[in-house]
């Protein structure tokens, strides 16, 4: 096994947790159910995962800079304790061979009781991952669940010490719909 990329993820003091996504993550964690998060660039996918994991150690790999073979080499040995494993940027897998290899690896990891797998992508569930999704019943969190509620948006503005008028707050909501 190659050297693991183990990260202690840190949180942002200005971050406001989207409760809809938070509740789904808590349920998935309690059952160690694979999670598939997706959303457009800037929708807060990776930040949300970092905040949720807090100071917990995890193995993190982005397919942007880590090959599938290297990610497979990072997979921990079976253990009494569980490992949190995050694979980011799945949308960057371009070749059929990479997608197939990654799909196989995800199936292996999802089947293990000592691994909690979190997958992050810009795209909804891709066709090449549907078999694993059905077999292992992934929890899916889409970008709409990463959006803030009106109350959460107001908390965000307060953290930045911004005090817009009620009219401005409504306008911000109309324009952004809670997009982080």
Where are these regions (language model features)?
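Walker A/P-loop nucleotide-binding motif
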Residues: 31-49
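Amphipathic alpha-helical "lid/sensor" segments that cap RecA-like P-loop NTPase cores
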Residues: 42, 47-48, 140, 158-180
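Conserved catalytic segments around the Walker B and adjacent sensor/switch elements
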Residues: 54-68
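Conserved P-loop NTPase "ATPase switch" module shared by AAA+ and STAND
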Residues: 77-102
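Conserved AAA+ ATPase "sensor/coupling" helix adjacent to the nucleotide-binding pocket
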Residues: 135, 152-163
């Amino acid at each position: 096994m190659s050297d693991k990329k183990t990260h202690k993820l840190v949180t942002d003091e200005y971050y406001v947790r989207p409760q809809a996504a938070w509740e789904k993550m808590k349920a998935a964690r309690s059952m160690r159910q694979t999670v598939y998060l997706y959303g457009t660039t800037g929708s807060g996918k990776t930040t949300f995962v970092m905040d949720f994991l807090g100071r917990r150690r995890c193995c993190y790999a982005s397919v942007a800079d880590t090959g599938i073979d290297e990610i497979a080499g990072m997979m921990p040995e079976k253990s009494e304790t569980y490992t949190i494993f995050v694979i980011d940027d799945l949308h960057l897998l371009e070749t059929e061979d990479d997608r197939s290899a990654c799909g196989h690896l995800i199936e292996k990891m999802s089947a293990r009781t000592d691994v909690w797998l979190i997958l992050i992508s810009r795209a909804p569930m891709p066709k090449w991952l549907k078999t694993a999704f059905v077999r292992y019943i992934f929890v899916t969190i889409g970008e709409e669940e990463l959006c803030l509620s009106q109350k959460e948006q107001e908390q965000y503005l307060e953290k930045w010490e911004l005090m817009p008028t009620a009219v401005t707050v409504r306008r911000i909501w109309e324009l952004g719909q809670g997009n982080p």
